[in-house]
Amino acid sequence: GFAGVSMKDADRYALELVQEACSDLGSRLFLRIREELGLAYYCGAQNFPGVAPGYFAFYVGTAPDKVKLVEEELLKEAALLREKGLSAEELNRAKAKLIGQKKIARQDLGGLAQTVALDELYGLGYENIDAEDTKYEAVTIAETKRVALKYLKADALVVSVIGPEKA
């Protein structure tokens, strides 16, 4: 994983779209690592912004004997994100999915109240929810590349592997 952003950081929107684009069954991670190479049971990305900067991480469920290969592939994918950012197709799909999920969540009064309350608590303001869709829509391919370069640094990552105990 990598150091991430805070809730107030404007980079949050581009980084959330990178996370979304790397996390579903049509994502570059899933297609390459699981489907093409057969190295994983599941894979994706997590982006956890917080009051203080959080983290961005890739995760994979794999067999113990495939850990090194998976790690190499994840590093290659991070390098591709730094080099090119998301493709237009990936970015558009991520925007549609993320904005759609947020619109559905806003239909539930409890979820809406919780989001507005948390936005106020985090110092974003209760009206933040009304501006989010526009902020996601404004993210460009160049911005996804810029945030990947800024946050997915090869020399500033932490690798954590959890597996069975060795006898």
Where are these regions (language model features)?
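Generic solvent-exposed, charged/amphipathic alpha-helical segments
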Residues: V18-Q19, L75, K145, L149
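M16 family metallopeptidases and their MPP-like homologs
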Residues: G1-S6, L31-E83, A88-A138, A156-G163
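Proteolytic maturation boundary segments
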Residues: V139-A167
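Active/ligand-binding-proximal structured segments within catalytic/core domains
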Residues: D9-C22, L31
